[in-house]
């Protein structure tokens, strides 16, 4: 969102020879700006293709991300290249009629990017605070309607005022000859900045703060529920040997620490997202208002702050997928050279050996899956009858369940002798024995 066409009562800038190009350091500046442009276009294009080609990513929530990446891609392809030429040469070097059109696209694309960030925060807010009702509230037609509304508002805040000359009402300043800068009046700047930045920023702060509070509350509830369930399970177990003193409290502290770390990670994630948004865009809008009030911002400083705002379109496709596991996995499948490290879960002690095969309660997707719990013995598989050696760590082995075998046959738990085994059942589900 930059810059400023026209003298008083004219929607086109004043033209003349203009200042010469910057004599020193222009090569390094051009190289840096080219890197920003290429990175912005490549990253946003990659993520748009990734969402469109990976079935796991085609959901309602990612509609908003596609809209965000589309607006950021337009910033990289339509807005940044003319802005780079304008910064390097110190004047508008393209066709005279393109100045107003480029300025309108500049305002529209950057405003659409900010409004899409607001929609993403709203979507996350509904998903976290009411996950059971989310599918009913955020349907695909409603998501598309919100996206269309955001783009319509961005277009109305850019093309309509500039074409009708509303930005010139009450203005008494003219740009330098050969410049393409939007020297808008103070009323226009206040209204446009409020609609496209300050109101969406307030909504983003509100939703992310509510998400943070909800994440902390859920972490505390899950920690207390888990420790309470573990304690109740211990009271009902027939323990053949006396557990070590302090074992229960140590495991409870470990679980509480785990959920505290999750809440801290959520806090850091939201802090990074909010921090990057305000660091990149807030200086520009403050300078834009100051420029309309006192004309005390130099063109060079204004260009730097403008490019800082453009960099938000570069950071969005890097920051948002960075904290989303689905994007990491899809990117690893889409790009063979990218290897995502496996997820590390807290190691739990393996259960004792037994000659039986166990089936978890959660085996809804496969009635044929069994959980191999033996460490050193061999289990006769119910299908082939061939022995199968079990590793030291639990692993899933897909086997057809014999016809007539109930999904959860009655029988005592396979193991229930210590707190660690109870925690294992809390994590992976209740375990029932299945006769071979």
Curated annotation (Swiss-Prot):
GO terms for biological process: adenylate cyclase-activating serotonin receptor signaling pathway; adenylate cyclase-modulating G protein-coupled receptor signaling pathway; cerebral cortex cell migration; chemical synaptic transmission; G protein-coupled receptor signaling pathway, coupled to cyclic nucleotide second messenger; learning; long-term synaptic potentiation; negative regulation of acetylcholine secretion, neurotransmission. Disulfide bonds join 99-180. Serotonin binds at residues 106, 288. Keywords: Cell membrane, Disulfide bond, G-protein coupled receptor, Glycoprotein, Membrane, Receptor, Transducer, Transmembrane, Transmembrane helix. Its main location: membrane. Residues 53-62, 123-142, 210-266, 324-436 are cytoplasmic. InterPro entries: 5HT6_rcpt (IPR002232), GPCR_Rhodpsn (IPR000276), GPCR_Rhodpsn_7TM (IPR017452). Residues 1-27, 89-96, 168-185, 294-299 are extracellular. Pfam families: 7tm_1 (PF00001). PROSITE patterns: G_PROTEIN_RECEP_F1_1 (PS00237), G_PROTEIN_RECEP_F1_2 (PS50262). It comes from the Eukaryota. Localized exclusively in the central nervous system, predominantly in the corpus striatum but also in various limbic and cortical regions. The chain crosses the membrane at residues 28-52, 63-88, 97-122, 143-167, 186-209, 267-293, 300-323. Glycans are attached at residue 9. One of its GO terms (molecular function) is neurotransmitter receptor activity. GO terms for cellular component: cilium; dendrite; plasma membrane; synapse. It is found in: Cell membrane. Specificity for G(s) G alpha proteins is determined by the length of transmembrane regions 5 and 6 (TM5 and TM6). Belongs to the G-protein coupled receptor 1 family. G-protein coupled receptor for 5-hydroxytryptamine (serotonin), a biogenic hormone that functions as a neurotransmitter, a hormone and a mitogen. Also has a high affinity for tricyclic psychotropic drugs. Ligand binding causes a conformation change that triggers signaling via guanine nucleotide-binding proteins (G proteins) and modulates the activity of downstream effectors. HTR6 is coupled to G(s) G alpha proteins and mediates activation of adenylate cyclase activity. Controls pyramidal neurons migration during corticogenesis, through the regulation of CDK5 activity. Interacts with MTOR, RPTOR and NF1. Interacts with CDK5. This is 5-hydroxytryptamine receptor 6. It comes from Rattus norvegicus. The gene is Htr6.
């Amino acid at each position: 969102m930059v810059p400023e066409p026209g003298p008083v009562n004219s929607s086109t800038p004043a033209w003349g020879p203009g200042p010469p190009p910057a004599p020193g350091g222009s090569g390094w500046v051009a190289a840096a700006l080219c890197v920003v442009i290429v990175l912005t276009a490549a990253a946003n294009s990659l993520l748009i293709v990734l969402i469109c080609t990976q079935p796991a990513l085609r959901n309602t929530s990612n509609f908003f991300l596609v809209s965000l990446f589309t607006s950021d891609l337009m910033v990289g392809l339509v807005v940044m290249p003319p802005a780079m030429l304008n910064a390097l040469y110190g004047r508008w070097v393209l066709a005279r009629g393109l100045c107003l059109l480029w300025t309108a696209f500049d305002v529209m694309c950057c405003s659409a990017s900010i409004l899409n960030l607001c929609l993403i925060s709203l979507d996350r807010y509904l998903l976290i605070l009411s996950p059971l009702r989310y599918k009913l509230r955020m349907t695909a037609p409603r998501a598309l309607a919100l996206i269309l509304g955001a783009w319509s508002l961005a277009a109305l805040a850019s093309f309509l005022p500039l074409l009708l000359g509303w930005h010139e009402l009450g203005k008494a300043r003219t740009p330098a000859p050969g410049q393409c800068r939007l020297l808008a009046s103070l009323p226009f700047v206040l209204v446009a900045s409020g609609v496209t930045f300050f109101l969406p920023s307030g909504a983003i702060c509100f939703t992310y703060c509510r998400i943070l509070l909800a994440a902390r509350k859920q972490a505390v509830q899950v920690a207390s529920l888990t420790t309470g369930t573990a304690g109740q399970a211990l009271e009902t177990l027939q323990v053949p040997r006396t557990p070590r003193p302090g074992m229960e409290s140590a495991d409870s502290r470990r679980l509480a620490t785990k959920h505290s770390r999750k809440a801290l990670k959520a806090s850091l994630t939201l802090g990074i997202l909010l921090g990057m948004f305000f660091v990149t865009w807030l200086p520009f809008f403050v300078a834009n208002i100051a420029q309309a009030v006192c004309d005390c911002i130099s063109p060079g400083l204004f260009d730097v702050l403008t490019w800082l705002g453009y960099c938000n379109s570069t950071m969005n496709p890097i920051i948002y997928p960075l904290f989303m596991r689905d994007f990491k996995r899809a990117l690893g499948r889409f790009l063979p050279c990218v290897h995502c490290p496996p997820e590390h879960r807290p190691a739990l002690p393996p259960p004792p050996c037994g000659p039986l095969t166990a089936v978890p309660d959660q085996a809804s997707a496969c009635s044929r899956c069994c959980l191999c719990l033996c460490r050193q013995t061999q289990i006769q598989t119910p299908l082939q009858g061939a022995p199968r050696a079990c590793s030291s760590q639990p692993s899933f082995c897909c086997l057809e369940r014999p016809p007539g075998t109930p999904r959860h046959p009655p029988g005592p738990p396979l193991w229930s002798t210590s707190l660690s085994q109870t925690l294992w059942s809390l994590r992976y589900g209740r375990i029932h024995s299945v006769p071979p």
